[in-house]
């Protein structure tokens, strides 16, 4: 069953999401409609995460190399600059490229919940695809977030603002949680965690 805002708020008070915003924020200053932000916080049946400003990496082409998920070469990634102007802080994701960021919020997924991460409509309409995998029962940490820019234009990816939406699905209790099996991505810090086996 998909969980609602009442459940999300209750579980957040028990530490499921930190820091937590109990309502959907669309303006940093509620009285100043001139300064909108990409919404974040609790919505009717989900939670909009923010992108951390701490790190954003972009894949680069190194002639003659092939990426290997069993032996990932971090040299295939390059750090990007955090830019700032009157619209806010942002990274640039080049056209037809792939980037990795990290969620500002830390999560602690309950043992009977699986979390699915999907894109936000504002970014989707610019060709940005969120390709983040599920957060399983018992997983804890900062999600590493994956993005593809499928458009032919560079795109701003705003930091400290909404980047994707989490959906919380409740299931029957499982016999082994992600924490029980000592999953390799458990307790990810607020930095990009690279592929590992």
Identify the role of each PLM range.
Residues 1-197:
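DUTPase catalytic domain/fold
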